[in-house]
Amino acid sequence: MLRISKLTDYATVLLAALSAQPQALHSASGLADRTGIGAATVSKLLKELHRAGLVSSTRGARGGYQLARPPAHISAAEIIDAVEGPVALTECAIHGGHCELEPTCGVGLSWQRVSRALRSALEGLSLADLMDHDARVRAPNLRAALDAGWQPLTRV
């Protein structure tokens, strides 16, 4: 079964939480509380998302995290790449020449074509697109917090 990892799903939830108030700085602990994702997992994912250029961070007592780009400019492919590595269905779709079966394989090129089509579809799907469908179902803790008047850390 093809499926993204739970960590990629969590990373997407965190990015959606950051996009709720894009100008604000969000603490890792605050994001953990609001999303229901464990604090250690949130910290790990924020580091990976920062390394990939999807979030920016500000250090210090008034620091925190925010999206590095608008949600419409962050693709699903970039999110998956940040957490799981390159999108590909088979090893040869990423690293041609590293498979012992390659000399006799009759399907490698077809899988590469499928991987390219999948990657293209994911590149055409933005974080904004992912958040466009009923956010209450996908991130109930975040929505409840926003509805209750929660305000993240803001720059002073």
Predicted regions and their residues:
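C-terminal regulatory/oligomerization modules of transcriptional regulators
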Residues: 98-156
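A short alpha-helical element within helix-turn-helix/winged-helix DNA-binding domains
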Residues: 26-36
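Short coil turns linking two alpha-helices in DNA-binding domains
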Residues: 38-41
